[in-house]
């Protein structure tokens, strides 16, 4: 199946007003403006965007708003690394969208370079929160580090140093795993584009959890709040269900909100298209189907939350800090589900239906070959 060449203008992309998404609380961190500034500083320092138009598109994307909506417990001294990670993620996503095949993107080489930037760091005492590391906020007039690695790898390495130095080894391992899956998913998306293949629903859910970058984004909830969920609870059936369902809600809603833009650029790895193909229905019926799925996922999430509360209540030896970490993480996942919708409904990244990308520069990945 190929995507339609014309984009229907009458598609209803938002859920009905009584949808379960709107029953989740809307949140907003007070740090939005500072986050918007930091995002542009990261992009400027590492020269990650293609000139004034792309820089303006980055500004108009309002990534700071997305972070502010989805990380309501974000601590002031942790803004810069979070802003840096989202800058990296959106730029690399746009870069890969410009390649017709994984080979053209040099995917294997790129993945190894990015993962090399994510080496384990000693899990010592976290730096004092009232004394962030020197140079915590990048400055526009700073020169990027000199070396053989490409700018996106250099930027990720700096972001990772600031993130990992505050986190446990277990958190670092989980984040690195999720980042590897995120990078792996680019190859499958490129294969789909190359062969104009809309994926089957049977494998799409797992692919989309990885390609959407939502799993490392949820890991960052713990960094942002300065509270880590105990490792055993992370592996509980209840919390795994909550993470999976929150991830699915975010990426499937994103598929709906980005549909018009993805039809224009020829993207085929989209849940709405997968549903349309599998069920043999039109795009609007597929969108409605997706939102019914999202409502069911939220219901499963909330029932798992109740079960997790019971588990924590009977788990002898849990500290108050552990319970607070679980509560904050749960609250953050709800903020992500709602905040992604509210941000995506107005961000020019999706509202502006065009082919402008933040960067088309292959040197950011370390290669000059283009499709």
Spell out what each predicted region is:
Residues 1-371:
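Alpha-helical, largely C-terminal catalytic domains
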């Amino acid at each position: 199946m190929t995507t339609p060449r014309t984009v229907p203008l009458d598609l209803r992309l938002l859920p009905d007003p009584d949808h379960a998404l709107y029953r989740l609380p809307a949140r907003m961190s007070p740090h939005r403006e500072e986050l918007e500034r930091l995002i542009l500083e990261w992009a400027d320092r590492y020269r990650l965007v293609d000139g004034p138009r792309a820089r303006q598109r980055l500004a108009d994307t309002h990534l700071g708003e997305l972070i502010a909506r989805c990380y309501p417990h974000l601590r002031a001294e942790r803004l810069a690394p979070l802003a840096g990670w989202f800058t990296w993620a959106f730029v690399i996503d746009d870069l890969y969208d410009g390649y017709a095949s994984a080979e053209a993107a040099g995917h294997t080489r790129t993945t190894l370079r990015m993962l090399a930037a994510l080496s384990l760091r000693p899990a010592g005492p976290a730096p004092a929160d009232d004394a962030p590391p020197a140079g915590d906020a990048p400055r526009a007039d700073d020169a990027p580090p000199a070396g053989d690695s490409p700018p996106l790898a250099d930027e990720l390495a700096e972001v990772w140093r600031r993130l990992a130095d505050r986190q446990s080894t277990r958190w670092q391992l989980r984040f690195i795993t999720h980042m590897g899956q995120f990078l792996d998913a680019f190859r499958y998306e490129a294969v789909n584009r190359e062969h104009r293949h809309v994926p089957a629903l049977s494998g799409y859910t797992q692919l989309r959890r990885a390609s959407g970058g939502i799993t490392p984004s949820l890991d960052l909830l713990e960094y942002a709040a300065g509270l880590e969920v105990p490792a055993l609870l992370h592996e509980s059936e209840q919390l795994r269900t909550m993470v999976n369902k929150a991830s699915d809600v975010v990426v499937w809603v994103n598929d709906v909100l980005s549909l018009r833009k993805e039809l224009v650029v020829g993207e085929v790895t989209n849940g709405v298209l997968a549903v349309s193909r599998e069920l043999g229905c039109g795009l609007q019926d597929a969108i409605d189907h997706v939102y019914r799925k999202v409502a069911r996922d939220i219901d499963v999430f909330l029932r798992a939350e109740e079960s997790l509360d019971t588990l924590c209540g009977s788990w002898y030896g849990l500290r108050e800090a552990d319970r607070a970490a679980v509560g904050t993480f749960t609250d953050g996942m709800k903020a992500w589900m709602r905040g992604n919708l509210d941000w995506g409904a107005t961000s020019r990244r999706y509202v502006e239906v065009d082919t402008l990308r933040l960067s088309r520069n292959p040197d950011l990945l370390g290669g000059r070959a283009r499709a």
